[in-house]
Structures are given as C-alpha cells and as structure tokens.
Amino acid sequence: MRSSSIRSLLWKETRQLGRNRTAMLTAAMLPFIILFLAPIQLLVALHFGGSPGIEELRNSPLPGFADVTDPSQLIVQFFYPMLLVMGGLLLPSLTTTYAIVAERERRSLELLISLPVSVAEILAAKLLAVLAVTALIGLPYVAIVLTLLLILGIAGAGTIPALLAPFLAAVACSICISLLLTLLARDFRTANNLSGAFVVPALLLTVGTLGAVGGPARTYVVAVILLALGALALVAALRWVSVERYLE
C-alpha cells in the first residue's frame, strides 16, 4: 500500500464523513450519552450519597468486588471501565456502517475503483477516517470525565492509564471488527445485525472480566482480552475473507 494514496483518500473520506449528517449525529449523540452523560450522573449520585444499586453491587459475592470498600472504588473500577468499553466499541462500528457499508449500498464504489488505487488502500483510508472521527468525538468526552475524577479527588493520577487502556483497546478492537463487518455486510440491515453479533459478546466478556478479576489490574486484563478479540477479527478479515470481497 502507498502512503501517499492513503493520505489523499483519507482527506476525501474525512470530508465525506463530515458532510454526512446522519453519520455525524449518530457518532456524536451516542458517545455523549455513554461517555459523558452517564459518567456525570454517576458522579452526581456519588456526591449525594450514592444509590441503592451501587451499594448492592458493592456487597456482591463476585470475586472482583471483594476488595471494593466504598462506592467511589466501584465507580472507578467497574462502572467507568464498562462505559468506556461500551463507547469505544460502539462509536467506530456505527460510524463504519454509515461511512462504508452505505457506500456499497448506494453503488458509489465504481468512482473510487476508477482511480489508480487498490482496494486495500481504499479500505485503509476509510478505517483511518473512522478512527479520526472516533478520536475527534470520543476523546474530548473521556478527557473531561477523567479530569473531573482528578479534580474531585475520586481517583489518582495512576487511575488515568488504567481507565484509558480499556477504552483505547475497545476502539482498536472495534476498528478490526469494522473491517470484518465491511467485508461481510451488503446493506444496513445486515451490517446492524452483524455489528450486534460482534459487539455484544465483547461487552459480555468485559462485564464478566470486571466482575471476576479483582484489583486495579482488572482494566488491563480487559484491555488484553479486547486486543485479542480485535486480532482474531483482523486475522479473519485478512485470511478467510478476501479484501476483494468488498467489490462484490
């Protein structure tokens, strides 16, 4: 693949995504709820003395909660990682549906194929554009929430990488899943069904790991699992599903 071709295509894809109101609205609203509004609501609940749900989960017999001694720990070590993973998984996959699958459905690929570029370069540029949109929209929400944790004294500086690790791993995993989704899906309906089939198991594994693994290392374990899932999706996309399938 040629980096010059990818850069040119990336600029074109980023501009095209910016003009797609449906894609941008979906990419903006869902992360706002998952990565910003829900964490802020948890902070408000904690400030006013917690909630019954938090207290019940803190007293759960699950081994992952054995070392949790107060609601703030529960929020930082369980709820926030879960929300960050959810946002990191959903944002790229939803953007991919509008950015890539919709183009196949509209039969507008012929214009791109007529250019002196390969299918691999087209896909690389599209996925990099999805990654750019994810960073542009998702990272500010995450940065605000993590800054509030530090300002309010709920978490220390060492907690920041522990929370960023599962989020970044979820984004990487979702990008790899998006590549596989791009090669398999033919229309919006198929893309949405496949997206749920890929993302839901990753979310269930995340929740199970957070509940089963104790201590601050739990988020890093989640990150490793998500990266492993992403690697499997990438291998499946490159080895068992031909990139040329994108043209079919």
Q: What is the role of each PLM region?
A:
Residues 1-31:
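Aromatic- and glycine-rich beta-strand/loop motifs that create alpha-glucan
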Residues 100, 184, 228-248:
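Junction motif at the cytosolic side of a transmembrane helix
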Residues 132-173:
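Secretory targeting signals
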